[in-house]
Amino acid sequence: MKGLSGCKIIAFICSKDLATCLPISISEIMTQKYKVFINNKPKIIVTDWKKFCAHYILIEAAGGLVYNREDELLMIFRNGKWDLPKGKKEEAEEIESCAKREVEEECGVSGLEITEKLIDTYHIYTHKGKKVLKRTYWFKMTTNFEGVLIPQTKEGITKVAWVK
């Protein structure tokens, strides 16, 4: 992501093997507001965000793009896929605190510092027969942590790694 000043948007492109983070411009996102691509053709799915959200249970979560001194990115391996550390916000918890707590719990790192607020992403899924819309707040973080990374196995995380 070096050399992309002003780029504050991250696109998550998922394949069956891993999630890849790619920087894209804010103008690209704004031109696609409330659009979904179906068979490579844009289709507007909603014109009123509140009306759209009314069909779902809303959940807030937070996570981080965490870099160490070597400019390596912290990744977790959960459910057979590489992903970024993130998790659900507890009641009355500040979103920044949630992001740091989740990274600490899922990876065993400490000394996290939030350096930048990134974008929010949305994920739709079904849980126990109910439709859920999860909003995840993303933060760029740094750490000087040099200890052993510890995956949170009770959350299904089997590996934690720094990647270039």
Identify the function of each model-found stretch.
Residues 3, 9, 14, 19-21, ...:
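Nudix hydrolase/Nudix homology domain
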Residues 23-63:
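Acidic, metal-coordinating catalytic segment for phosphate/diphosphate chemistry
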Residues 78-79:
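C-terminal lobe/hinge of AMP-binding adenylation domains
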Residues 85:
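Compact nucleic-acid interaction/catalytic patches
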Residues 88-164:
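Unchanged
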